[in-house]
Amino acid sequence: MNQSSLLAEFGDPITRVENALQALREGRGVLLLDDEDRENEGDIIYAVESLTTVQMALMIRECSGIVCLCLTEAQADRLALPLMVVNNNSANQTAFTVSIEAKHGVTTGVSAQDRVTTIKTAANPQAKPEDLARPGHVFPLRARAGGVLARRGHTEGTVDLMQMAGLQPAGVLCELTNPDGSMAKTPEIIAFGKLHNMPVLTIEDMVQYRIQFDLKLA
């Protein structure tokens, strides 16, 4: 069965997006899948403003361990976060910046609590470059202007979801893995979502939603 058939039990694309937005407003996580011919992976996504240590611990335990903070270009510029490399030749052009750590309120920076502290420090609209040390254990990503209509990536999907939910435009993501360390695919992602009360949606759902409602996002 393909992705669309497997997700049909969660409703049509518009319903799936609306369920995800409501979950984020309630402080719950969502699972976002990209296209089957792209990475074909699912990321756990949480809103920064409601992110808890328990949620971060779940991400570290159940995912790849590379916890990323998705930011707008404006916030990344405000923090003076340059791209990790000048010449990005990765397959999907993922816009990693230099990694970061909060300068205050953390120990080694690697614990769930420390990562939450770093993330909330960086996402604060009043944050300054000097609030952060570089490198660190959190990996910021710059979301492309135009969101999923410009790039069909998890980074843009995360920031779009936050804006669509009326939340601060910053979210965290991490790729869901199976217990054996392999990448979770659609059937495993759906099972995980049911177990943890997380709505499942796709980038394509978001594209359809934005086009249907003519959503102009930053």
Swiss-Prot record:
The keyword Lyase applies. GO terms for cellular component: cytosol. SUPFAM superfamilies: YrdC/RibB (SSF55821). Binds 2 divalent metal cations per subunit. Magnesium or manganese. Its EC number is 4.1.99.12. Pathway: Cofactor biosynthesis; riboflavin biosynthesis; 2-hydroxy-3-oxobutyl phosphate from D-ribulose 5-phosphate: step 1/1. It is an enzyme of class 4 (lyase). GO terms for biological process: riboflavin biosynthetic process. Mg(2+) 1 binds at E39. Keywords: Lyase, Magnesium, Manganese, Metal-binding, Riboflavin biosynthesis. The record marks H137, E175 as: Essential for catalytic activity. Gene3D superfamilies: DHBP synthase (3.90.870.10). D-ribulose 5-phosphate binds at R38, E39, D43, R151, R152, G153, H154, T155, E175. Disulfide bonds: none annotated. Its cofactor is Mg(2+); Mn(2+). Mg(2+) 2 binds at E39, H154. HAMAP family: RibB (MF_00180). Homodimer. NCBIfam families: ribB. PANTHER family: 3,4-DIHYDROXY-2-BUTANONE 4-PHOSPHATE SYNTHASE, GTP CYCLOHYDROLASE II-RELATED. Belongs to the DHBP synthase family. Catalyzes the conversion of D-ribulose 5-phosphate to formate and 3,4-dihydroxy-2-butanone 4-phosphate. This is 3,4-dihydroxy-2-butanone 4-phosphate synthase. It comes from Vibrio cholerae serotype O1 (strain ATCC 39541 / Classical Ogawa 395 / O395).
